[in-house]
């Protein structure tokens, strides 16, 4: 079954709470202060079963101007709205402000309800009806049905239920199969259970035992118990009013305005890119003006950066970047409201384009074009642009979040885009990583050039060190993605991978006849020299070799296991080194030994033995203890 949330809106004391009670039998005024003053201060909630059996959740919002923040916390989760106007007063200031908010948030399904019709004459009611129609002209409620009721006598209540039923039937349900998003509007503690949060489930399904997180606090938790309208349930679906008992979190750590989410779904941010409309009649908005920001149940102070102008006038729209004073979570296409810093008045609203953008400089044509494309583009075009702008690629689930698409829709779009050659999908640890095909091909061209140059310059080496290649071209790429990229090119037959090196497919070290003879002569020289090997400089002189050429030959012999590099000056033949280790091991069997004793045992000199012992210390074969050494390895 699909669940729809219906909310009230309208001026204080216009009968919203009484209307909800007439529809549902539930008095949503729950605070003592509300009972005494006769006005709603906090949000009220009640379930409603319609004639068709369809389930609605009714949200009763405060009408008093001082409680507009509570109203904003409730209106964000509405699928339908009832704009309530009292027949004895007509359209009032908060009627107009609530209507402006509904219009800015684009809550397109709604009903206009004129209440208290038992208090007025027919001709007066006709005037109020006309006044209301004039007020909603040009807004999302311009063509909304109008129902006249009396909660006291019950007149019109049955018709209102039928109208709600008809509207609910054509209202798209919220996505129950997606990721969980529940903006929190209440936090409290229940003895024996602990922390409980409540809110309207915007998307997804929560089941008892599900792992969740609270953002922007970054708290990990689990759904211990669930209630929907006071009934304990095993799962709650999008569109329902839910109370979630959270495991492992103190009540003081969670706040109204936070969001309960599928782990990794939304990222806290201090910046938001958006399109914003300033209301007609609002004072001009200057660059970096301070404002109150409202999205879902969250409220934050921030500043508006006008990206294409210095001042925004009433009725105008502009691309902006919001700089928040505390972290918030948002998704693309979320709608928000701004109120002026002082006096606090609703000045406009807009839509999120990028929930985690980089910092922008103003008056940058490429930034403005990019944001406009994202604002107007199809899901596929938006997804393609997001991937294009992420030069190092991004995880497909992150792409879904940034594009405000379901995981299922994102996967289908990516597969279609990959088949069309727009995107390359890389398998990374049983997941998908999306890279623009243009970028993927540019990477391969850069790697090809680098390896061709390396093989030409160092024909004796098996390949370029993996980490060196990464530092040159892929330093910003996560290690797991870089590894997957190399493995993909290896599977495609483009590269050959060794433990620490990478080479072009088919490459093998090549030698000239002269080099082959030099390699044999070098091996012989080090084998014969045994425990008194020549220095690097001596070898270069005796073979008349350039130092860089000699270094390449010696490195090759080291890689082949013929020689061992002791330090920058000395190389030892592996056989000679093994024999020396046995001599040292026998020497140490009688106790710690010094440099002179090792020198005598090897029949060599300090010039050769000291570097040898320092090397053996490095490889953990020996350990120095004062002026002596002991053997600690095999």
Swiss-Prot record:
PROSITE patterns: G_TR_1, G_TR_2
Region of interest (G5), residue spans: 150-152
GO-annotated molecular function: GTP binding; GTPase activity; RNA binding; translation elongation factor activity
Chief place where the protein resides: cytoplasm
Residues annotated for GTP binding in this entry: 10-17, 60-64, 115-118
Region of interest (G4), ranges: 115-118
Gene3D superfamilies, per database record: 1.10.10.2770, P-loop containing nucleotide triphosphate hydrolases, Translation factors, Winged helix-like DNA-binding domain superfamily/Winged helix DNA-binding domain
GO biological process, alphabetically ordered: selenocysteine incorporation
Keywords from the named record: Cytoplasm, GTP-binding, Nucleotide-binding, Protein biosynthesis
Region (G1): 10-17
Annotated segments matching region G3: 60-63
Matching CDD domains: SelB, SelB_II, selB_III
Subcellular locations according to the entry: Cytoplasm
Region (G2): 38-42
Assigned GO CC terms: cytosol
tr-type G domain ranges (all copies): 1-173
PANTHER family: ELONGATION FACTOR TU, MITOCHONDRIAL (PTHR43721:SF22), ELONGATION FACTOR TU-RELATED (PTHR43721)
Protein family per UniProt: Belongs to the TRAFAC class translation factor GTPase superfamily. Classic translation factor GTPase family. SelB subfamily.
Function: Translation factor necessary for the incorporation of selenocysteine into proteins. It probably replaces EF-Tu for the insertion of selenocysteine directed by the UGA codon. SelB binds GTP and GDP.
Name of the protein in its database record: Selenocysteine-specific elongation factor
Species: Moorella thermoacetica (Clostridium thermoaceticum)
């Amino acid at each position: 079954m699909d669940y729809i949330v219906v909310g009230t809106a309208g001026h204080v004391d216009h009968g919203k709470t009484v209307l909800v009670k007439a529809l549902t039998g539930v008095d949503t005024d729950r605070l003592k202060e509300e009972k005494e003053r006769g006005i709603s201060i906090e949000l009220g909630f009640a379930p409603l079963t319609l004639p068709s059996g369809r389930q609605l959740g009714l949200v009763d919002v405060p009408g008093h101007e001082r409680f507009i923040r509570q109203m904003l916390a409730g209106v964000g989760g509405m699928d339908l709205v009832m704009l309530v106007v009292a027949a004895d007063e007509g359209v009032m200031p908060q009627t107009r402000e609530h209507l402006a908010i509904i219009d800015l948030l684009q809550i397109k399904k709604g009903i206009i309800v004129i209440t208290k019709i038992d208090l007025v004459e027919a001709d007066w009611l006709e005037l109020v009806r006309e006044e209301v129609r004039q007020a909603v002209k040009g807004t999302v409620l311009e063509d909304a049905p109008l129902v006249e009721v009396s909660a006291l006598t019950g007149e019109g209540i049955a018709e209102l239920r039928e109208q709600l039923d008809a509207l609910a039937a054509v209202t798209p349900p919220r996505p129950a199969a997606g990721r969980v998003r529940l903006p929190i509007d209440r936090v409290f503690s229940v003895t024996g259970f602990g922390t409980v949060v409540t809110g309207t489930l915007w998307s997804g399904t929560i089941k008892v035992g599900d792992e969740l997180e609270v953002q922007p606090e970054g708290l990990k938790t689990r759904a211990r118990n669930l209630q929907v309208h006071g009934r304990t349930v095993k799962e709650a679906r999008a569109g329902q009013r839910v109370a979630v008992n959270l495991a492992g979190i103190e009540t003081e750590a969670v706040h109204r305005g936070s969001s309960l989410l599928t782990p990794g779904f939304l990222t806290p941010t201090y910046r938001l890119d958006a399109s914003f409309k300033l209301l007609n009649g609002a004072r001009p908005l200057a660059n970096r003006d301070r404002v109150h920001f409202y999205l879902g149940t969250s409220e934050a102070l921030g500043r508006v950066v006008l990206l294409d102008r210095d001042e925004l006038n009433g009725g105008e729209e502009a691309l902006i970047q919001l700089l928040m004073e505390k972290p918030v979570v948002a998704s693309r296409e979320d709608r928000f409201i701004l109120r002026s810093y002082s006096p606090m008045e609703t000045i406009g609203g807009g839509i999120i384009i990028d929930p985690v953008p980089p910092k922008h400089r103003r008056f940058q044509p490429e930034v403005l074009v990019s944001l406009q494309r994202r604002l107007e583009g199809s899901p596929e075009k938006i997804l393609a642009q997001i991937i294009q702008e992420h030069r190092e690629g991004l995880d497909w689930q992150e792409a879904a979040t940034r594009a405000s698409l379901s995981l299922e829709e994102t996967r289908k779009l990516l597969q279609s885009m990959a088949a069309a050659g727009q995107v390359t999908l890389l398998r990374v640890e049983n997941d998908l990583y999306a890279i623009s095909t243009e970028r993927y091909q540019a990477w391969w061209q850069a790697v090809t050039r680098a390896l061709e140059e390396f093989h030409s310059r160092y024909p004796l080496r098996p390949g370029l060190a993996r980490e060196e290649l990464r530092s040159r071209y892929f330093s910003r790429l996560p290690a797991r993605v870089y590894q997957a990229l190399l493995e993909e090119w290896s599977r495609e037959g483009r590269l050959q991978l060794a433990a620490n090196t990478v080479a072009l497919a088919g490459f093998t070290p090549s030698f000239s006849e002269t080099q082959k003879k030099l390699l044999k002569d070098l091996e012989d020289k080090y084998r014969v020299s045994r425990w008194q090997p020549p220095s690097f400089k001596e070898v270069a002189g005796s073979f008349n070799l350039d130092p860089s050429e000699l270094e390449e030959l010696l490195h090759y012999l080291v890689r082949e296991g013929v020689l061992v590099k002791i330090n920058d000056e000395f190389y030892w033949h592996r056989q000679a080194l093994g024999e020396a280790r046995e001599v040292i091991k026998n020497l140490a069997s009688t106790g710690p030994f010094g440099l002179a004793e090792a020198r005598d045992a090897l029949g060599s000199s300090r010039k050769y033995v000291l570097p040898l012992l320092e090397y053996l210390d490095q490889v953990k074969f020996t350990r120095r203890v004062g002026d002596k050494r002991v053997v600690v390895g095999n």
